[in-house]
From Swiss-Prot:
Its EC number is 3.5.1.-. This is Pyrrolizixenacetamide deacetylase. InterPro entries: AB_hydrolase_1, AB_hydrolase_fold, Meta-cleavage_hydrolase. Belongs to the AB hydrolase superfamily. Homodimer. The lineage of its organism: Bacteria, Pseudomonadati, Pseudomonadota, Gammaproteobacteria, Enterobacterales.
Length: 266
């Protein structure tokens, strides 16, 4: 594990593989390992993959102040620069997609292409706002209940049913034990306040937006809103829940590789 100092934060990040730079940005409550670790064998032969843990995740440490998207974007960029992989392709998941949007808008000279999975621009939508407020409350009062809620809203019904009782228990228990709950609480506050709409309008990089047809955390309508704002963005959809890269990593990797390795993409 590597570290780079950014403001008051000591940002941890992983480097794997060889080739051009590919930076993966995790989502709320996730980290570089739980969101991306299982995908490394499919990526590291073609890219040098950098996986930062932004504030609130992994072993990254800071003073605990309120999170801002520009500061998290700066942390991700600093990790990429420290790893010497600029320019790079960027992949963001959920809150990480909002961070990627901010980076592509504010650091265009560093970015080649971007992929956004389960993306949203803001939580102005009342359903999304209510959901994140519920997450915030359950982090304080009942983390096991929140873990069950994330399972039910984060995966497709068929995927959950196929796990059986024991499989579902394993997933729930892994959420309870592996999530950095205090850090997630800070990230949820950012989910509630974030708005990268203006940044999205400034993006001029090739962009692939991946929605998820069974997503009940960030419905695919949110991803389609991103497509309407980013000039020239492509849209495709996976038949999964929000946690598509965990539910169906093979299909996610196929989409990722097809876009990032395409000779038709500048």
């Amino acid at each position: 594990m590597n570290k780079v100092k950014v403001g008051d934060a000591q940002v941890s990040y992983c480097i794997d593989g060889k080739g051009p730079g590919l930076v993966l940005v995790h989502g709320t409550g996730g980290d570089s390992e739980t969101n991306w670790g299982h995908l490394m064998p499919a990526l590291t032969n073609d890219w040098t993959v950098v996986r930062p843990d932004y504030s609130g995740s992994g072993i990254t440490s800071d003073e605990g102040k309120q999170l801002e998207v520009k500061e998290i974007a700066a942390q991700v960029v600093a990790a990429a620069e420290a790893a010497r992989v600029v320019p790079f392709d960027l992949v963001g998941f959920s809150l990480g997609s909002a961070v990627v949007i901010a980076i592509a808008a504010d650091y265009p000279h560093l970015v080649r292409r971007i992929v956004l999975l389960g993306a949203f621009l803001s939580s102005r939508d009342i359903r999304q706002k209510t959901q994140f407020e519920l997450w915030r409350d359950l982090i304080r009062t009942d983390r096991a209940a929140l873990s069950r809620l994330i399972l039910l809203t984060g995966f497709s019904p068929d995927f959950i049913s196929k796990q059986g009782h024991d499989g579902v228990s394993v997933i729930i228990n892994s959420f309870v034990s592996e999530i950095n709950w205090e850090g997630m609480a800070r990230q949820v506050e950012l989910d509630l306040s974030i708005d990268v709409s203006e940044a999205a309008r400034r993006i001029e990089k090739p962009t692939l937006v991946i929605g998820c047809s069974h997503d009940h955390i960030v419905p695919s309508s949110q991803a389609k809103s991103v497509v309407r704002i980013i000039r020239g963005a492509q849209y495709t959809e996976l038949h999964t829940g929000h946690l598509a890269h965990i539910e169906n990593p093979e299909e996610f990797i196929l989409l990722l590789r097809s876009f990032l390795l395409s000779e038709d993409v500048p």
